[in-house]
Amino acid sequence: MELKLHIIKSIQAAIAAGKAINTVYHSEDFGVEYKSDTSPLTVADQKSHEIIMNVLQDFDIPILSEEGKDAPYAQRKDWQRFWVVDPLDGTKEFIKRNGEFTVNIALVEDGRPTLGTIFVPDRDTLYFAAQGFGAYKLEDGPFDELQHAPANSAEQARILLGQIVEQSTQLPIEHPRQAALT
């Protein structure tokens, strides 16, 4: 039951963050700054991060976010469960205005991902998968269950991921969604 609540909250966080990203995306100024590693940081990155942190802080689970404070390894090495967040994955693509950016949220337990949520704001498309629940896509209507083969080992998962990467240049998105998610 607890995982179900995590799924719901991760979806709510991703969609709310994506809507904030889209507001900035369709504005004139992204407020681009550069981090110490010279990667770009926009107002959309910051707003998305704040929204996700506000939604997920209801749980007593640490959050490791690309835009958050650095948690030293000495602190996080003992985390049994934690959120991994990239509030705006593809900031360079966001700046190019090509629509190829996502909000990514994952829950890791005992070193293994148990939940993953990806929202594509420009296409209004949501993907999520959770251990014991399957994998789903939401675009233009109800959730569609995605077909997947079970990975029996880390090696099988690595091989499968390699095949997907070789055959794909972008997320499997057919058409932009017309109506906003509610």
Regions found by a protein language model. Give the residues of each.
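Acidic beta-strand-loop-alpha-helix segment within the catalytic core
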Residues: A106-T182
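Glycine-rich active-site/cofactor-binding loop and its immediate structural neighborhood
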Residues: R81-D122
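Conserved protein kinase catalytic core
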Residues: P72-Y73, K92-I95, L126
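Residue-level signal for inorganic ion chemistry
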Residues: I21, D45, L56, T91, ...
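Residues that scaffold the ATP/ADP-binding catalytic core of kinase and kinase-like folds
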Residues: V24, E93, L138
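N-terminal subdomain of lithium-sensitive/metallo-dependent phosphomonoesterases centered on the IMPase/IPPase/PAP
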Residues: M1-L88
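A short, compositionally biased
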Residues: S27-E28, F101, A129-F133
